[in-house]
Amino acid sequence: VDNEIKALADKERLPVSLVQLDVIDETSVKNAIQSIMTETGKIDVLVNNAGYGLSGALEELTIDEIKTQFETNFYGLIRTTQAVLPIMRKQKSGVVVNISSGAGRFGYPSGSAYVSTKFAVEGLSESISYELEQFGIKVVLIEPGFVKTGFDRATISSKKSQDPHSPYLQMMKKIDAASSKMVQNGCSPELVASAVLEAVTSNSPNLRYLVGKDVEGWVKSKKSMSDAEFHQMMAKGLS
Protein backbone atom coordinates (compact mmCIF):
# COMPACT_ATOMS: atom_id res chain seq x y z
CA VAL A 1 0.00 0.00 0.00
CA ASP A 2 2.84 2.40 0.86
CA ASN A 3 4.38 1.89 -2.58
CA GLU A 4 1.01 2.49 -4.25
CA ILE A 5 0.54 5.75 -2.35
CA LYS A 6 4.06 6.90 -3.18
CA ALA A 7 3.59 6.08 -6.85
CA LEU A 8 0.29 7.97 -6.99
CA ALA A 9 1.78 10.95 -5.16
CA ASP A 10 4.73 11.06 -7.54
CA LYS A 11 2.43 10.83 -10.55
CA GLU A 12 0.28 13.71 -9.32
CA ARG A 13 3.32 15.61 -7.99
CA LEU A 14 1.86 15.76 -4.49
CA PRO A 15 4.11 16.43 -1.48
CA VAL A 16 3.15 13.42 0.63
CA SER A 17 5.00 12.14 3.70
CA LEU A 18 4.13 8.68 5.00
CA VAL A 19 4.22 7.98 8.73
CA GLN A 20 3.68 4.51 10.17
CA LEU A 21 0.84 4.33 12.69
CA ASP A 22 -0.89 1.36 14.32
CA VAL A 23 -4.20 2.43 15.85
CA ILE A 24 -4.17 -0.39 18.40
CA ASP A 25 -0.75 0.62 19.73
CA GLU A 26 -0.75 3.65 22.07
CA THR A 27 2.99 4.26 21.61
CA SER A 28 2.72 4.04 17.83
CA VAL A 29 -0.05 6.64 17.81
CA LYS A 30 1.87 9.04 20.06
CA ASN A 31 5.08 8.66 18.04
CA ALA A 32 3.26 9.24 14.75
CA ILE A 33 1.56 12.40 16.01
CA GLN A 34 4.84 13.68 17.43
CA SER A 35 6.56 13.03 14.09
CA ILE A 36 3.86 14.92 12.20
CA MET A 37 4.00 17.87 14.59
CA THR A 38 7.79 18.02 14.31
CA GLU A 39 7.53 18.16 10.52
CA THR A 40 4.49 20.41 10.08
CA GLY A 41 3.75 22.11 13.39
CA LYS A 42 -0.01 21.59 13.05
CA ILE A 43 -2.74 19.08 12.26
CA ASP A 44 -5.77 20.36 10.37
CA VAL A 45 -7.57 17.12 9.56
CA LEU A 46 -7.77 13.65 11.07
CA VAL A 47 -9.40 10.92 8.98
CA ASN A 48 -10.10 7.79 10.99
CA ASN A 49 -10.28 5.12 8.31
CA ALA A 50 -8.69 2.05 9.90
CA GLY A 51 -11.05 -0.89 10.25
CA TYR A 52 -12.07 -4.34 9.10
CA GLY A 53 -15.20 -6.47 8.99
CA LEU A 54 -16.05 -9.45 11.16
CA SER A 55 -18.77 -11.72 9.83
CA GLY A 56 -20.63 -14.36 11.78
CA ALA A 57 -23.74 -15.07 13.80
CA LEU A 58 -23.46 -13.76 17.36
CA GLU A 59 -23.83 -17.24 18.84
CA GLU A 60 -20.71 -18.33 16.98
CA LEU A 61 -18.54 -15.29 17.69
CA THR A 62 -16.06 -15.52 20.53
CA ILE A 63 -15.67 -12.69 23.01
CA ASP A 64 -12.04 -12.33 21.88
CA GLU A 65 -13.12 -11.94 18.24
CA ILE A 66 -15.56 -9.21 19.23
CA LYS A 67 -13.02 -7.46 21.46
CA THR A 68 -10.47 -7.44 18.64
CA GLN A 69 -13.07 -5.98 16.29
CA PHE A 70 -13.78 -3.15 18.74
CA GLU A 71 -10.07 -2.61 19.42
CA THR A 72 -9.46 -1.60 15.81
CA ASN A 73 -12.78 -0.14 14.67
CA PHE A 74 -13.69 1.79 17.83
CA TYR A 75 -10.91 2.08 20.41
CA GLY A 76 -8.33 2.73 17.69
CA LEU A 77 -10.41 5.67 16.52
CA ILE A 78 -10.59 6.98 20.08
CA ARG A 79 -6.80 6.73 20.48
CA THR A 80 -6.04 8.81 17.41
CA THR A 81 -8.78 11.32 18.17
CA GLN A 82 -7.63 11.85 21.75
CA ALA A 83 -4.08 12.32 20.48
CA VAL A 84 -4.96 15.17 18.09
CA LEU A 85 -7.63 17.00 20.09
CA PRO A 86 -5.23 18.96 22.34
CA ILE A 87 -3.45 20.14 19.19
CA MET A 88 -6.64 21.16 17.40
CA ARG A 89 -8.03 22.78 20.54
CA LYS A 90 -4.90 24.91 20.86
CA GLN A 91 -5.19 25.83 17.17
CA LYS A 92 -8.91 26.59 17.66
CA SER A 93 -9.55 24.71 14.43
CA GLY A 94 -9.60 21.24 12.91
CA VAL A 95 -11.80 18.57 11.39
CA VAL A 96 -12.19 15.02 12.66
CA VAL A 97 -13.55 12.74 9.94
CA ASN A 98 -14.74 9.33 11.07
CA ILE A 99 -15.33 6.78 8.33
CA SER A 100 -18.43 5.01 9.53
CA SER A 101 -20.79 3.00 7.32
CA GLY A 102 -24.40 2.54 6.41
CA ALA A 103 -24.03 -0.19 9.02
CA GLY A 104 -23.99 2.62 11.56
CA ARG A 105 -27.65 3.25 10.73
CA PHE A 106 -29.13 -0.26 10.64
CA GLY A 107 -28.27 -3.84 11.49
CA TYR A 108 -28.12 -6.91 9.28
CA PRO A 109 -27.62 -10.65 9.88
CA SER A 110 -24.01 -11.80 10.41
CA GLY A 111 -22.96 -8.23 11.16
CA SER A 112 -23.64 -7.95 14.88
CA ALA A 113 -20.00 -7.27 15.81
CA TYR A 114 -19.16 -4.95 12.91
CA VAL A 115 -22.47 -3.10 13.10
CA SER A 116 -22.01 -2.60 16.84
CA THR A 117 -18.66 -0.88 16.25
CA LYS A 118 -20.21 1.45 13.70
CA PHE A 119 -23.19 2.27 15.92
CA ALA A 120 -20.61 3.11 18.60
CA VAL A 121 -18.69 5.35 16.20
CA GLU A 122 -21.91 7.15 15.27
CA GLY A 123 -22.86 7.79 18.89
CA LEU A 124 -19.37 8.90 19.85
CA SER A 125 -19.08 11.25 16.88
CA GLU A 126 -22.43 12.90 17.49
CA SER A 127 -21.60 13.36 21.18
CA ILE A 128 -18.16 14.90 20.68
CA SER A 129 -19.50 17.22 17.98
CA TYR A 130 -21.21 19.13 20.81
CA GLU A 131 -18.11 19.04 23.02
CA LEU A 132 -15.71 20.31 20.36
CA GLU A 133 -17.84 22.97 18.69
CA GLN A 134 -16.76 25.58 21.26
CA PHE A 135 -13.13 25.09 20.17
CA GLY A 136 -13.77 25.46 16.45
CA ILE A 137 -13.32 21.73 15.84
CA LYS A 138 -15.75 20.06 13.46
CA VAL A 139 -16.75 16.38 13.49
CA VAL A 140 -17.93 14.53 10.40
CA LEU A 141 -19.27 11.04 9.75
CA ILE A 142 -18.82 9.50 6.31
CA GLU A 143 -21.32 6.67 5.78
CA PRO A 144 -20.58 4.64 2.65
CA GLY A 145 -22.55 1.69 1.43
CA PHE A 146 -20.74 -1.01 -0.50
CA VAL A 147 -17.54 0.31 -2.09
CA LYS A 148 -15.43 -1.28 -4.81
CA THR A 149 -12.32 -1.72 -2.68
CA GLY A 150 -10.57 -4.67 -1.06
CA PHE A 151 -12.62 -4.30 2.12
CA ASP A 152 -14.62 -7.44 1.36
CA ARG A 153 -11.35 -9.38 1.20
CA ALA A 154 -10.37 -7.85 4.53
CA THR A 155 -13.56 -9.11 6.14
CA ILE A 156 -12.92 -12.01 8.51
CA SER A 157 -15.39 -14.82 9.12
CA SER A 158 -15.67 -16.15 12.65
CA LYS A 159 -13.96 -19.50 13.09
CA LYS A 160 -17.13 -21.31 14.12
CA SER A 161 -19.13 -19.96 11.17
CA GLN A 162 -16.82 -21.89 8.83
CA ASP A 163 -17.80 -25.19 10.42
CA PRO A 164 -19.75 -27.27 7.84
CA HIS A 165 -22.05 -28.35 10.67
CA SER A 166 -22.87 -24.78 11.73
CA PRO A 167 -26.64 -24.20 12.12
CA TYR A 168 -26.05 -20.82 10.44
CA LEU A 169 -24.17 -22.21 7.43
CA GLN A 170 -26.93 -21.68 4.86
CA MET A 171 -27.61 -18.16 6.09
CA MET A 172 -23.91 -17.31 5.85
CA LYS A 173 -23.70 -18.68 2.30
CA LYS A 174 -26.62 -16.48 1.23
CA ILE A 175 -25.10 -13.43 2.89
CA ASP A 176 -21.68 -14.02 1.30
CA ALA A 177 -23.25 -14.36 -2.15
CA ALA A 178 -25.38 -11.24 -1.70
CA SER A 179 -22.43 -9.23 -0.36
CA SER A 180 -20.19 -10.20 -3.28
CA LYS A 181 -22.83 -9.02 -5.73
CA MET A 182 -23.35 -5.76 -3.85
CA VAL A 183 -19.62 -5.02 -3.81
CA GLN A 184 -19.52 -5.44 -7.60
CA ASN A 185 -22.33 -2.89 -7.88
CA GLY A 186 -20.92 -0.61 -5.19
CA CYS A 187 -19.75 2.96 -5.54
CA SER A 188 -16.19 3.92 -6.40
CA PRO A 189 -13.62 4.82 -3.73
CA GLU A 190 -13.27 8.15 -5.51
CA LEU A 191 -16.87 8.97 -4.57
CA VAL A 192 -16.05 8.39 -0.90
CA ALA A 193 -12.90 10.50 -1.22
CA SER A 194 -14.95 13.30 -2.80
CA ALA A 195 -17.31 13.26 0.18
CA VAL A 196 -14.36 13.54 2.55
CA LEU A 197 -12.91 16.42 0.52
CA GLU A 198 -16.25 18.22 0.50
CA ALA A 199 -16.54 17.83 4.27
CA VAL A 200 -13.04 19.05 5.16
CA THR A 201 -13.18 22.06 2.84
CA SER A 202 -16.64 23.22 3.91
CA ASN A 203 -17.05 26.05 6.41
CA SER A 204 -20.16 24.34 7.75
CA PRO A 205 -19.93 20.60 7.03
CA ASN A 206 -22.79 18.25 7.70
CA LEU A 207 -22.46 15.84 10.59
CA ARG A 208 -23.31 12.93 8.26
CA TYR A 209 -22.57 12.23 4.61
CA LEU A 210 -24.21 9.20 3.01
CA VAL A 211 -22.18 7.89 0.08
CA GLY A 212 -23.68 5.51 -2.48
CA LYS A 213 -27.09 4.92 -4.01
CA ASP A 214 -27.46 1.63 -2.13
CA VAL A 215 -27.06 3.10 1.35
CA GLU A 216 -29.15 6.14 0.43
CA GLY A 217 -31.99 3.77 -0.47
CA TRP A 218 -31.64 1.70 2.69
CA VAL A 219 -31.58 4.73 4.99
CA LYS A 220 -34.58 6.24 3.19
CA SER A 221 -36.46 2.96 3.67
CA LYS A 222 -35.39 2.80 7.31
CA LYS A 223 -36.87 6.25 7.90
CA SER A 224 -40.13 5.64 6.06
CA MET A 225 -40.84 2.06 7.20
CA SER A 226 -41.79 0.63 10.54
CA ASP A 227 -39.20 -1.60 12.19
CA ALA A 228 -41.25 -4.65 11.19
CA GLU A 229 -41.46 -3.54 7.56
CA PHE A 230 -37.72 -2.86 7.35
CA HIS A 231 -36.98 -6.22 8.95
CA GLN A 232 -39.15 -7.97 6.35
CA MET A 233 -37.42 -6.12 3.52
CA MET A 234 -33.95 -7.11 4.74
CA ALA A 235 -35.00 -10.71 5.39
CA LYS A 236 -36.58 -10.97 1.94
CA GLY A 237 -33.26 -10.03 0.37
CA LEU A 238 -31.76 -13.20 1.85
CA SER A 239 -34.58 -15.55 0.95
Can you name each region flagged by the protein language model?
Residues 81-82, 126:
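A short, exposed helix-loop element centered on a Lys and neighboring polar residues
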Residues 134-206:
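SDR active-site lid
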Residues 13-15, 35-48, 54:
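A glycine-rich helix->loop->beta "capping" turn
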